[in-house]
Amino acid sequence: YTTYQKQFAECFGNHIGMAFKVVVCGVVVGVPLGWYAYKHARAGKVISTILNTIESIPSLALICVMMFPLSFLSNRFPFLKDHGIAGVGATPVFCALFCYALFQIVNSMYGALKVVDKQYIDAARGMGMTVRQIFTKVEIPIILPVIISGIRVSLTATVLGVTIGSYIGYGGLGKFILQGLNGFAIDIVMLGTLPIMGLVFLFDFVLKKLVVLIEIHRKAKGVVKV
């Protein structure tokens, strides 16, 4: 660690930064997309088919697939490189992991909305609520623990997935694992592996506790649960 202290700090920051960017974007896109898939059955089948197909592709293969269109675009439009969009590095890693995160969050949203008791929706309509108000004031509070559970699965999977980015030049903690394997240096491998494991267990623990706290608060307030 002493030898690679500065490099470790940079790689650690890159690793966490990529994971959070992927999951935040996944939530911003996935929550409304999951709601749309639930409200429109035909579109929901198309969305589900696309996301299930992407989910079935191995991580490294999907990252490599992303490299081709991104390389073409960055060569065709050179200004994209000035904004960090290229066929190697962070962009293909982000795009691939974003697709996986989207799968988890959309599925969580869709599955949770399906089991919301219709009597609460009907009661909200009877009070004159709009579709948006029903979603934000009725459905979201009911399914919030399920959404957070989906985010938990997505975040832990993304932290692991960022590791693979080292194979195409992204400098996360996977860089130490790859470097250690190439040099048969177990200490360097562990320098990358242990922090990744620690992050996975930490995020999993924190988000599980958050779900428990929300459930306790809901019981105190008398809010229904899925």
PLM feature segments, named:
Residues 7-18, 68-104, 188, 192-196:
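Loop-to-helix entry region at the N-terminal start of transmembrane alpha-helices
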Residues 8-36, 151:
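Transmembrane alpha-helix signature in integral membrane proteins
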Residues 28-33, 92-95, 99-121, 151-159, ...:
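Membrane-embedded alpha-helices of multi-pass transport/permease systems
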Residues 33-68, 97, 107-114, 121:
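Cytoplasmic-entry segments and transmembrane alpha-helices of multi-pass inner-membrane transporters
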Residues 68-69, 160-190, 195-196, 221-222:
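Glycine-rich helix-loop "coupling/hinge" segments at transmembrane-helix boundaries
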Residues 80-81, 85, 95, 111-114, ...:
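C-terminal transmembrane helix and the adjacent membrane-cytosol boundary/short C-terminal tail
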Residues 113-143:
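Short helix-to-coil transition segments within interhelical loops
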Residues 132-164:
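Transmembrane alpha-helices
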